[in-house]
Amino acid sequence: MRDPVETYMNLVPMVVEQTNRGERAYDIFSRLLKERIIFVTGPVEDNMSMLVVAQLLFLEADNPKKEISMYINSPGGVVTSGLAIYDTMQFIRPPVATLCTGQAASMGSLLLAAGEKDMRHALPNARIMVHQPSGGFQGQATDIMLHAQEILNLKKRLNEIYVKHTGQTYKAIEDALERDKFLTADMARDFGLVDKVIDKRAEEPAAPKAS
């Protein structure tokens, strides 16, 4: 059976551009990285988190003042992996603009909300879902109690992050995250998870005419 990662990489389109040294081929994601675009796609886990963090740090080193665009289509995943991305977004100097395409659920919604203020967007048919963290553990009773307390600590910390980025009260966040809460793009805007719902790319201003 073929490695699914190898199969996926074989499906990634290659693009060719002309440089002063001749033609150069890139996979499409590397080419978009040159335009300072990062993709957070699929489940949030350690390997994906490591790649996103590395790209954020690389783009900061390339230009510490120019904005980074993060396109999110994720069902969420591991809390600590998501927090690694979140902390790096807050740590680096360039502003990070976020855009939800498809879905931003669980940790995906937190990363969407964590973008720079007034630079958090969703496409019209995007779906956003927020909820409290979940987990399971087997073992000795004392260890189960310790893990349960850790989940409660994470829940409190995640609630505080949502409060910071949405402007909602802690009680409102706690109530909203008590169960899976599904939001349309417009509802996510009203809740403070995004700043604007966009359906078209903003047009570039016309160049001034020569006198």
Curated annotation (Swiss-Prot):
Keyword Hydrolase listed: yes
GO molecular function, one term: ATPase binding
One Pfam assignment: CLP_protease
Quaternary organization: Fourteen ClpP subunits assemble into 2 heptameric rings which stack back to back to give a disk-like structure with a central cavity, resembling the structure of eukaryotic proteasomes.
Record organism: Nitrobacter hamburgensis (strain DSM 10229 / NCIMB 13809 / X14)
Protein name, per record: ATP-dependent Clp protease proteolytic subunit
GO cellular component: cytoplasm; endopeptidase Clp complex
Reactions catalysed, as given in the entry: Hydrolysis of proteins to small peptides in the presence of ATP and magnesium. alpha-casein is the usual test substrate. In the absence of ATP, only oligopeptides shorter than five residues are hydrolyzed (such as succinyl-Leu-Tyr-|-NHMec, and Leu-Tyr-Leu-|-Tyr-Trp, in which cleavage of the -Tyr-|-Leu- and -Tyr-|-Trp bonds also occurs)
Annotated compartments: Cytoplasm
Function: Cleaves peptides in various proteins in a process that requires ATP hydrolysis. Has a chymotrypsin-like activity. Plays a major role in the degradation of misfolded proteins.
UniProt-listed Enzyme Commission number(s): 3.4.21.92
Superkingdom of this protein's organism: Bacteria
Keywords for the protein's UniProt record, in alphabetical order: Cytoplasm, Hydrolase, Protease, Serine protease
Family, similarity comment: Belongs to the peptidase S14 family.
A GO BP annotation: protein quality control for misfolded or incompletely synthesized proteins
Active site location: S106 (nucleophile), H131
